[in-house]
Amino acid sequence: MNKFFLAPSILSADFARLGEDIKKVIDAGSDLIHFDVMDNHYVPNLSMGPMILESLRNYNITAPIDVHLMVKPVDNLIPQFAKAGATFITFHPEATLHIERTLNLIKENGCKAGLAFNPATPLNFLDYILEKLDLILLMSVNPGFGNQSFLPSTFNKLREVRKIIDANFSDILLEVDGGVKLDNIADIACAGANVFVMGSGLFKYSNYKLVIEKIRKKLEYAHSRSIH
């Protein structure tokens, strides 16, 4: 594993200048956009729907977009977000009665499929559907709000999922979301993550390019540690 992907979280962007801000962070060296969708039911917060995603595509945002559905139920929204321009659609196992059917629905609508795990969600769901996944998302905070601290218990979970992925010779992406900062991203990478959702840890800075250069250096260091 020698490629790392930065995924700025749209929740921390400037909503008054959303398209402009997202374009700036992509041009500064980000790889994809993390698009959080919350329903004030599955999680205690409310965010945006497919119209916002479609508007970003119309603004000529061409980078991959990972739509993270923190909603319940989930299936009726999948075709809408796929049509609006999602690249990945990621959902939580608690949000559907039939995980495999929901994964199939995502694929049928032309998107890559991800499964998200809250800090307290067990990993045994992976025993049944690993081969259908393109991405596994581990929440390193309890979902619903930004600017939370990274939960240290996530490290063991990351190592466990990395072993599962590698044991199956899989190229599934392993994403972590919550409290990812300059001072911990190298340790998170060494634990097995290769996609890093960054909210306030990136958007709070005025010079995105400079911060991303610093992040890349941290990740280069993590990669050098992992191969020795």
From Swiss-Prot:
Give the UniProt keywords, A-Z.
Carbohydrate metabolism, Isomerase, Metal-binding
- InterPro entries, sorted: Aldolase_TIM, Ribul_P_3_epim, Ribul_P_3_epim-like, RibuloseP-bd_barrel
Coiled coil regions in record: none
Catalytic positions?
36 (proton acceptor), 177 (proton donor)
Give the pathway listed in the UniProt entry for this protein: Carbohydrate degradation
Where does this protein hold substrate? 9, 68, 177-179, 199-200
The catalysed reaction is:
D-ribulose 5-phosphate = D-xylulose 5-phosphate
Gene3D superfamilies xref list: Aldolase class I
Quote the record's cofactor note. Answer: Binds 1 divalent metal cation per subunit.
Q: What is its EC number?
A: 5.1.3.1
Query: Which biological process, per GO, is one annotated for this protein?
Result: pentose-phosphate shunt
Judging by the UniProt lineage, the source's domain of life is Bacteria
Tell me, what's a Pfam family for it?
Ribul_P_3_epim
Q: Does the keyword Isomerase apply?
A: yes
Q: Which GO terms describe its molecular function?
A: D-ribulose-phosphate 3-epimerase activity; metal ion binding
Which residues participate in a divalent metal cation binding? 34, 36, 68, 177
Q: Which family does it belong to?
A: Belongs to the ribulose-phosphate 3-epimerase family.
Under the heading PANTHER family, the entry gives:
RIBULOSE-5-PHOSPHATE-3-EPIMERASE (PTHR11749)
Q: What does this protein do?
A: Catalyzes the reversible epimerization of D-ribulose 5-phosphate to D-xylulose 5-phosphate.
Q: Which NCBIfam families does the record cross-reference, listed alphabetically?
A: PRK05581.1-4, rpe
Kindly provide the name given to this protein in its UniProt entry.
Ribulose-phosphate 3-epimerase
Instruction: List the source organism.
Output: Buchnera aphidicola subsp. Acyrthosiphon pisum (strain APS) (Acyrthosiphon pisum symbiotic bacterium)
Gene name? rpe
